[in-house]
């Protein structure tokens, strides 16, 4: 019997979905991403969403100002789609190398999404321009109708929004972000080369029992919400199969402790400090380490048409405890897996 690997060396990965926030929060969390990842797709859902080229340039500079010396990191900016967005502004940003993609948030689906799209028809001219130019559409795939159960939002979105959209714009590049259901896993698997998906570590590691049984665990609460174990298993099987249109997207989404541990807590897991090791643990459990590098470092660039990173990252089998909290101005952050011991960690 072969002894398990003690070191995993992979091409430097990218994070294809991250929230870096702004202000003191941004300064606190950026180094956890820039230390490990060569690039990251930065979500545009600030309190004042990123809808113009100038706003994206200014935000990118604030991110770069927070990157520690010695970190080689490129933030990839996204445009927040609204019903009133000017397609010419998006095209200009894309041609000038400011916007890498555009993000569709259904109105009120998640944090700072009140400015989001009320219907796909409202932005069809923008989407048609994106299809023509090859700009990827990043989708938070949930309906937000009051009569739809929160655990059914993703499956309903596929039937009522995603599939009609892709039938109408057959060459539009779409990333179905943070998929959480067997329905989405099968839908992406059955799709063509214009459809891909990101998957978070929390949706691979946990299901709704982990969040709700024996007491509510607010630091596992995110949107889309954790689902049944049958959905978790479908996601694990998808990545373990070596499927090439699924790739790393942490959806690391920090909120201060007092905004998570409250009677009406915010959605989001701050997983940047432990995400890569968490993914490695899942792939190891699934006997799929042969596909780990592709998921982290190859599949994303291939879909986006970008070069692979040239550097390397090593993970070592070295049990380490995740800190219980991280200082944040006059508050703190509780990271994903706080206080728990993980078996894979990034070599410093």
Curated annotation (Swiss-Prot):
Cofactor mode of binding and number, as noted: Binds 2 Zn(2+) ions per subunit.
Q: Do you know which CDD domains this protein is assigned to?
A: DHOase
Catalytic activities: (S)-dihydroorotate + H2O = N-carbamoyl-L-aspartate + H(+)
Binding-site positions, Zn(2+) 1: 17, 19, 103, 251
Annotated EC: 3.5.2.3
N6-carboxylysine carried by residues: 103
| Residues given in the record as substrate binding sites | 19-21, 45, 140, 223, 255, 267
Q: Which GO terms describe its cellular component?
A: cytoplasm; cytosol
The coenzyme or cofactor needed here is: Zn(2+)
Residues the record lists as binding Zn(2+) 2: 103, 140, 178
| A GO BP annotation | 'de novo' pyrimidine nucleobase biosynthetic process
Q: Does the keyword Metal-binding apply?
A: yes
Physiological role: Catalyzes the reversible cyclization of carbamoyl aspartate to dihydroorotate.
Q: How does it assemble?
A: Homodimer.
Protein name per Swiss-Prot or TrEMBL: Dihydroorotase
Give the classification, highest ranks: Bacteria, Pseudomonadati, Pseudomonadota, Gammaproteobacteria, Enterobacterales
């Amino acid at each position: 019997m072969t002894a398990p690997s003690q070191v995993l060396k992979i091409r430097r990965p990218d994070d294809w979905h991250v929230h870096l926030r702004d202000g003191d929060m941004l300064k606190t969390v950026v180094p956890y991403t820039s230390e490990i990842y060569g690039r990251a797709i930065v979500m545009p859902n600030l309190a004042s969403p990123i809808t113009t080229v100038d706003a994206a340039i200014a935000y990118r500079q604030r991110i770069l100002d927070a990157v520690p010396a010695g970190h080689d990191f490129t933030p990839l900016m996204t445009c927040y789609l609204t019903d009133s967005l000017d397609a010419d502004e998006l095209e200009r940003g894309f041609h000038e190398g400011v916007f890498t993609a555009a993000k569709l948030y259904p109105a009120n689906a998640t944090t700072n999404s009140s400015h989001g799209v009320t219907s796909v028809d409202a932005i069809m001219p923008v989407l048609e321009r994106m299809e023509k130019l090859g700009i990827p559409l990043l989708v938070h795939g949930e309906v937000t109708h009051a009569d739809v159960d929160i655990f059914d939002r993703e499956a309903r979105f596929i039937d009522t929004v995603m599939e009609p959209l892709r039938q109408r714009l057959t060459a539009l590049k779409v990333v179905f972000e943070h998929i959480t259901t067997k329905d989405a896993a099968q839908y992406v698997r059955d799709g063509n080369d214009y459809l891909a998906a990101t998957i978070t570590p929390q949706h691979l590691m946990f299901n709704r029992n982990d969040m709700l049984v024996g007491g509510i665990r607010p630091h596992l609460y995110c949107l889309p919400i954790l689902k049944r174990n049958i959905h978790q298993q479908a996601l694990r099987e998808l990545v373990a199969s070596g499927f090439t249109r699924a790739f790393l997207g942490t959806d690391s989404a920090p909120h201060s402790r007092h905004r998570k541990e409250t009677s009406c807590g915010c959605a989001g897991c701050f997983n940047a400090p432990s995400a890569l090791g968490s993914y490695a643990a899942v792939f190891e459990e699934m006997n799929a380490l042969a596909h780990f590098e592709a998921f982290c470092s190859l599949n994303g660039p291939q879909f986006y048409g970008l070069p692979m990173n040239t550097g390397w990252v090593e993970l070592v089998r070295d049990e380490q405890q995740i800190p219980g909290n991280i200082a944040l101005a006059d508050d703190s952050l509780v990271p994903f897996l706080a206080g728990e011991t993980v078996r894979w960690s990034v070599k410093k």
